Amino acid sequence: MFYYNDNRIKKRCALLMSIVLLVCLAAVLPMQVRAADAAIYPMYQRAVDFPQGDLSRLAQVIRKAQAGGEINIGFLGGSITEGRGAANVQDCYVSQVYKWWYEAFPLAQINVINAGVGGTSSYLGVHRVDAELLVHKPDLVFMEFAVNDTFTEFCMNSYENLIRKILMSESNPALVLLFATNAVGDSSQAVQAALGQYYDLPMISYGKAVTPEVEAGSFTWFQIAEDIVHPNNMGHSIFAGLITTYLEDLCAKLDTIEVDAARLQQYELPEPVTMQVYQNAHIENAATITPLEVLGYDVYDFNYHFGDNWYSMQDGSYISFVVEASNIGILYQRTVEGTFGQYDVYIDDQYVKTLDGNYVEFYGTETEAEELFASPDGGKAYHVIKIVKNPTSFNTDFVIIGLLVS
């Protein structure tokens, strides 16, 4: 149950209502001005219309902030979390949520780690979460992969592995699942929310909040988004407002939430639903692994987020590695520049697949993560990975960002 009788909740909902009304008025939509309850409460109630989840970890973070402690808040996700669509960094939902914490708890030291990377799924997330987020010992993590993950067993597996990694990390962080959506309402929310319920986690859905409003004509999708996926300033404000309203609600009922610190320290995860194959997942790059053989590749920081890449620009180039793993993937760059070619991957002398560095879009680049090998029995062994230019590829450029190893 959620309570709205606290003045802070009313103020937050009033802010959300003003956002929605500004969207509508900006387009001069033929609609009636609705009361606050009718305009906002349904949006917020839909957004949090999940089983409540275990709030003890989150309540512990709030109490630590109230006491003036240092709070590390992590955000893990794709381009929406990175801030795509917002005009400026301060306009993205992550910055707005940070501002709420900063203003709500002036005695606390609030640190935010934004580990959002555009175009990436939970498969890459489970390989990078240790180095990019968990190393900072977060007290609270917000995670959003609903748009970039697909309705597949593969993504369900990586998403659950990621949940377990975060919950069992050294700092015992609270974890809140976020679900974005796109213009046609597609997302992997159903699968991810089922896992969230299984692990008794708090959840907030931007999709459940805005999609019915778009369908009802309260506002159009492109009044809250810059394209079919990414929220604009207004969309980011709505997303942030849903999260901060949820936090206001939690503050209002904080005294009713019991926290057993000893039990949290001895927390044991329930049995996994999927195979646990990514618990030791990490990324190997040019700074951490030496090629077995290499010709025509230079070490270069091509990717703005992931440094120490291998970059080939010549015909006949090849590179090979030896890794001990039960699962092997690759992270490589795709671009619209028109100079990137196709490269073949072999593992233990067996052809696996062809990677296409050419990105068929109107603009930009894409950081592509693909699994190449999965051990049938989950056992580790040494494997040789070789990457060579496809003989039919006219273009020669190719960037290997790293190997995904677990």
How should each PLM-predicted stretch be described?
Residues S79-E82, N232:
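Ser/Thr-glycine-rich phosphate-binding loops at phosphate-binding pockets of nucleotides
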Residues L76-S79, F219-W221:
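Short glycine/proline-rich turn/loop motifs
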Residues S79-I80, G116-G118:
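Catalytic nucleophile serine of serine hydrolases
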Residues M1-G74, T81-N88, P106-A108, S237, ...:
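N-terminal secretory targeting modules
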